[in-house]
Every structure is written in structure tokens, then in C-alpha cells.
């Protein structure tokens, strides 16, 4: 005879990606306009008033357009506080509200509240060494 065993499987919990790419690189310098001009002249950056924007495609299928912003800030900016570092990285994320809830449960320091603009939602957190990180859920 044949023996049959019923297999029961638990539905797999599919978690949304947290970080999908680098959304921006921000750093302090003495003269942001001069720094931007240097990068334009010597490295060919196509600059805008905020620095430059790099366009790329997210994922292997190359259908979802994404951007990374490169921006120099004045060395006197307070924008990176409470971090004492001269840089801040912006990470593109999916479902920022859900991610922030998860990070709170993981005891990650959330610096501020989620702000929404016409180009996406933003919040700042601190990493394990106190570096301020910007999380961005773009509206693509």
C-alpha cells in the first residue's frame, strides 16, 4: 500500500525591501559653489542648484527609474546634527511608515517625524555610531 502524509506549509512572510539604493550623498565643504564647479569642470558633473543628480534604473529589469542626489553643503550647516560627521547618506526605501515602525521596535534612534513632499517621504535616523542617515521613500 501507499502511505500519504499531508504537508502543511506556512505562508511565507514576504518582507518589503528596506533599502533599495543610495538616494543621496551629502557632505560639508568650505565653498559648495566652488566645489560643485570643480566637479563639473574636472569630472564632468551635469550640475544643478543642489549639486548633481545621477539617474539610474532600480532592479535587474531596468524599468523603474531612480535617482541619486550629490550635494555639497556649507561647512557651517546644522543639517547633519546631531551627528558630528561631515557627511550624511540618503537611502532610498520602500514603505517608509512600515520601516520606521520596524526600526522603532528594533530600538533604532529616530531623529524626527516623517515629512511628506511632492517628491517623497523623509525621516532621519542614527546608525550604531551616531551618524545621521536620511531615509527617503520617493514618489516615482
What are these regions (language model features)?
Residues 16-20, 26-71, 105, 121-123:
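Core segments of cupin and vicinal oxygen chelate
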Residues 43-46, 91-92, 112-115:
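Short linear motifs in intrinsically disordered
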Residues 1-30, 49-50, 77-140:
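Vicinal oxygen chelate
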Residues 60-63, 78-81, 114:
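Short secondary-structure boundary/capping segments
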Residues 72-77, 139-140:
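A short, sequence-level motif marking secondary-structure junctions
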Amino acid at each position: 500500500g501507499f502511505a500519504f502524509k499531508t504537508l502543511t506549509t506556512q505562508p511565507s512572510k514576504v518582507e518589503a525591501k528596506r533599502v533599495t539604493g543610495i538616494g543621496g550623498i551629502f557632505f560639508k565643504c568650505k565653498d559648495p559653489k566652488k566645489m560643485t564647479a570643480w566637479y563639473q569642470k574636472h569630472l564632468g558633473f551635469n550640475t544643478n542648484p543642489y549639486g548633481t543628480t545621477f539617474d539610474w534604473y532600480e532592479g535587474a529589469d531596468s524599468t523603474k527609474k531612480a535617482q541619486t542626489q550629490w550635494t555639497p553643503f556649507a561647512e557651517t550647516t546644522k543639517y547633519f546634527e546631531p551627528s558630528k560627521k561631515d557627511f550624511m547618506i540618503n537611502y532610498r526605501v520602500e514603505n517608509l511608515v512600515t520601516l520606521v515602525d520596524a526600526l522603532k521596535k528594533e530600538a533604532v534612534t529616530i531623529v524626527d517625524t516623517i515629512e511628506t513632499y511632492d517628491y517623497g517621504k523623509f525621516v532621519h535616523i542614527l546608525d550604531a555610531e551616531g551618524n545621521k542617515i536620511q531615509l527617503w521613500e520617493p514618489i516615482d
